[in-house]
Amino acid sequence: MAKDIKFSEDARSLMLQGVDKLANAVKITLGPKGRNVVLEKKFGSPLITNDGVTIAKEIELENPYENMGAKLVAEVASKTNEIAGDGTTTATVLAQAIIREGLKNVTAGANPVGIRKGIDKAVAAALTELHTISRPVSNKDEIAQVAAISAADDEVGQLIAEAMERVGNDGVITIEESKGFTTELDVVEGMQFDRGYASHYMVTDTDKMEAVLDNPYILITDKKITNIQEVLPLLEQVVQQGRPLLIIAEDVEGEALATLVVNKLRGTFNAVAVKAPGFGDRRKAMLEDIAILTGGQVITEELGLDLKSADISSLGRAAKVVVTKDNTTIVEGVGGADAIEARIGQIRAQLAETTSEFDKEKLQERLAKLAGGVAVIKVGAATETELKERKLRIEDALNSTRAAVEEGIVSGGGTALLNVYAAVEKVSESEEGDVATGVKIVLRALEEPVRQIANNAGLEGSIIVDRLKREEIGIGFNAATGEWVNMMEAGVVDPAKVTRSALQNAASVAALFLTTEAVVADIPEPAGAGMPDMSGMGGMPGMM
């Protein structure tokens, strides 16, 4: 396909139009008084949202040059979302500001490479200062504040804070859609995996259709059990102790399963069989996790162990096990604290090394089951449209909270970016030429989030920015109440990681944009020609 090439000013101005179209659609959502954007969906109801990255991903422009500009800024939002999980609108606003200011200078004759150096130096100084002024999250109230600011909802803030308190920082918090109108928190204590009983005859509570085992022994193996003779010596030892047994195996079937069911129905012996969770190497790792948590041992041929020679000392133990049709939950395993901590350290090391998102998710789940627990926030709403919007906001709030726990918090409402203004200004004083110009471009961009938050609140942004520069560090404008307050004390805070990622990613893409000198795009194909004239064929009169 033939290509169209545009150079220098022509290329950059068309791409800038795309940047502006996307950024202008996204930035109206910024701040406590930001508006929503409605996104058309081919199927189902439209999506109403104020989530920057969701809006950015939906925008496709007809002009290929404008579309390239828009996609570059969408990349800023997407990367910020990937790293910090929130702050995508702030990142978009910063990118637009750096690009616009930078292009003015490039058009006036400045060298884009020098400007890029200045931008990099300014951002490095800003990030160092951000790290200095951030402080760690110290209590549940601060976690609630971060979540409430992100979701613009105090109730959501409290729910997320409670979830994090109950499952710990390593716990897994998932967000699901509820069938009701209210948003609720459901916490699963202990280790849960998604495998249920092998036979419904094993249930002990017929009303709830679940098997509850108090103080059971737990047999953990990666073998398939079909012959009861394989486990008979072990079963006899457990029967002598008068305690129930949970069997976790690759499968329990045939004669072995029938014998367990018959003994359960006769009241001779209470045993519940479940399939081992996961597949392949992940199954081995999860069985090892269960063994460490319960103080048992995985009976596997890889370790030279078999079921016939195993004795009661190889079995794990727990205070309680609850097995439903779909899930098994082990509560209060008796595994040693040192062994569990060592295993947690091992999983954390694997988490740090892996690059696969899927592997990260599975490792995080395993970590949560060992270290904390699993909390589920069930989101309720009156309509499907409201449910989707609310779920997106809660996901952002949860990501914000995790980011705050990781790297601490700074003053919110764009105040932190102006608090680093003086540190960046010092860099501009020590530089000259185009490098100094690059630093000044970042200085101007640091004002933009505060300006936009004020504009969205119906105020004159420039007046707010000017006053904020004169205020002492920590004092900011609370757009929700229209008051000048100490932002930390008022609970208007942002995660330092979110602010850092937004600035870093915006500057990275904007600097690349400014050094662009040529843009190549496909030439659109002309509309297809109509059918040829078929009149008079075969001696017939022409078609009318």
UniProtKB/Swiss-Prot annotation:
Binding site for ATP: T29, L30, G31, P32, D86, G87, T88, T89, T90, G413, N478, A479, A480, D494
Signal peptide span: none
This protein's GO CC annotations: cytoplasm
Primary residence: cytoplasm
EC number per UniProt: 5.6.1.7
Pfam annotation, one family: Cpn60_TCP1
InterPro entries to which the protein is assigned, alphabetical: Chaperonin_Cpn60_CS, Cpn60/GroEL, Cpn60/GroEL/TCP-1, GroEL-like_apical_dom_sf, GROEL-like_equatorial_sf, TCP-1-like_intermed_sf
Localization per record: Cytoplasm
GO biological process, one term: protein refolding
Gene3D superfamilies associated with the record: GroEL, GroEL-like equatorial domain, TCP-1-like chaperonin intermediate domain
Family of this protein: Belongs to the chaperonin (HSP60) family.
Name listed for the protein in its UniProt record: Chaperonin GroEL
Organism: Lysinibacillus sphaericus (strain C3-41)
Lineage: Bacteria, Bacillati, Bacillota, Bacilli, Bacillales
